[in-house]
UniProtKB/Swiss-Prot annotation:
Observed effect of gene inactivation: Fixes nitrogen very poorly; has very slow diazotrophic growth on nitrogen-free agar plates. A double nifS-nifV deletion no longer fixes nitrogen.
GO molecular function, one term: pyridoxal phosphate binding
Residues given in the record as [2Fe-2S] cluster binding sites: 325
Gene designation per UniProt: nifS
EC top class, as a word: transferase
Name of the protein this chain belongs to: Cysteine desulfurase NifS
Subunit structure: Homodimer.
Organism: Azotobacter vinelandii
Function of the molecule: Catalyzes the removal of elemental sulfur atoms from cysteine to produce alanine. Seems to participate in the biosynthesis of the nitrogenase metalloclusters by providing the inorganic sulfur required for the Fe-S core formation.
Top-rank taxon: Bacteria
Family of this protein: Belongs to the class-V pyridoxal-phosphate-dependent aminotransferase family. NifS/IscS subfamily.
Length: 402
């Protein structure tokens, strides 16, 4: 029986069509695009086509607004650090408490260097308070960096409105759209977004390639200096094969956009309904009415998410957990804590993230496998007694966060 992969928010498999498009650029069209000979010209033309494909996916006005990078993290760092370098008189950054570590870790570093960092809180559904956000848009803010969609819950933020408010206040706005691109329509030419990050491996393209969208006229300072590549904005010989793959991925993302929002969405809903109909004391986290079509984050109370994942893996199902113990801490993820999910549930969150390759048969299999795994783990849980939770879970195991 084939394995079931439901961890597509972590990475996606590369489309066969994309692999085939990339192969010639390893062994046949291998020239440096900066070279004047035909080998270089062939690659240069292919890069231009890929740039235009990404431009179309993002709805950007100019293909020159597309800068190829190595990954989403590089794009995020470039955007934020550029905004600060271009405006040395401004010392404040606005972000959220639920950002990806690519942004949060950088903001923590900036805070240690003397910058003021405002981290916007979220409510129990992972939503932002726009009035609070607007009150922070002062003359000292250099950049706002807010993710378009949360990688754990799939909750979508009102990015267009937030960008407009920032732009009206004369503040640069950046969004990490790594999870959103290809799943929700984006029309940058009619938005107030100044900078946007994406990465290839969330789009069925290879790892090691990303994009920073930079609106024409936005003040910019390069992170990498050296050659003239990317119009002098990102030095280094282009990763041609991967960029070509990303271009094809952008074309296919447009082709499958409706599929993502209909068929994939329906499978995600079926997965949630099937599990919740059988498993008591479980619920979906995030905003069920405003989220990515492929993401289901389910909290299974009174058990550990990692234990669920290990048992799912034994039966050939790959998912991920929101409760990270990689640092030796028993705390759940920063996203669950920010949403004030009860500790008895936050420790048991599992994220199922689908793709256009996910089948109904695979979803049916997951629906069959999850309930007995949850029951098995609850039978040995200190929080569980018989057919329900103990009277006072806090006495069974003290929470490790307040």
């Amino acid at each position: 029986m084939a394995d079931v992969y439901l961890d597509n928010n972590a990475t996606t498999r590369v489309d066969d069509e994309i692999v085939q498009a990339m192969l010639p650029f390893f062994t046949e069209q291998f020239g440096n695009p900066s070279s004047l000979h035909s080998f270089g010209n062939q690659v240069g033309m292919a890069l231009k086509k890929a740039r235009q494909s990404v431009q179309k996916l993002l709805g950007a006005e100019h293909d020159s607004e597309i800068l190829f990078t190595s990954c989403g993290t590089e794009s995020d760092s470039t955007a934020i650090l550029s905004a600060l370098k271009a405006q040395p008189e401004r010392k404040t950054v606005i972000t959220t408490v639920v950002e990806h570590p690519a942004v949060l870790s950088l903001c923590d570093y900036l805070a240690s260097e003397g910058y003021t960092v405002h981290k916007l809180p979220v409510d129990k559904k992972g939503r932002l308070d726009l009035e609070h956000y607007a009150s922070l848009l002062t003359d000292d803010v250099a950049v706002v960096s807010v993710m378009w969609a949360n990688n754990e819950t799939g909750t979508l933020f009102p990015i267009e409105e937030m960008a407009r408010l920032a732009d009206d206040a004369g503040i640069m706005f950046h969004t990490d759209a790594v999870q959103a691109v290809g799943k929700v329509p984006i029309d940058l030419k009619n938005s107030s977004i100044h900078m946007l990050s994406l990465c290839g491996h969330k789009l069925h393209a290879p790892k090691g390639v990303g994009v920073l969208y930079l609106r024409r006229g936005t003040r910019f300072r390069p992170l990498l200096r050296g050659g003239h590549q990317e119009r002098g904005r990102r030095a280094g010989t282009e990763n041609a094969a991967s960029i070509i793959g990303l271009g094809v991925a952008a074309e296919r993302a447009l082709q499958f956009m409706e599929h993502e929002n209909t068929e994939v969405n329906a499978l995600r809903d079926k997965l949630e309904a099937g599990i919740l109909a059988v498993v008591p004391h479980a619920f979906v986290t995030g905003d069920p009415d405003n989220r990515l079509p492929n993401t289901a984050n389910i909290a299974f109370e009174y058990i550990e998410g990692e234990a669920i994942l290990l048992l799912l893996n034994k039966v050939g199902i790959a998912a991920s957990s929101g409760s990270a113990c990689t640092s030796g801490s028993l705390e759940p993820s920063h996203v669950m804590r920010a949403m004030d999910i009860p500790y008895t549930a936050a420790h048991g969150t599992v994220r199922f993230s689908l793709s256009r390759y996910t089948t109904e048969e695979e979803i049916d299999r997951v629906i069959r496998e999850v309930p007995p795994i949850v029951a098995q783990l609850r039978n040995v849980s200190p929080y569980w007694s018989g057919n329900g939770p103990v009277e006072d879970p806090g006495k069974a195991f003290a929470p490790v966060y307040g």
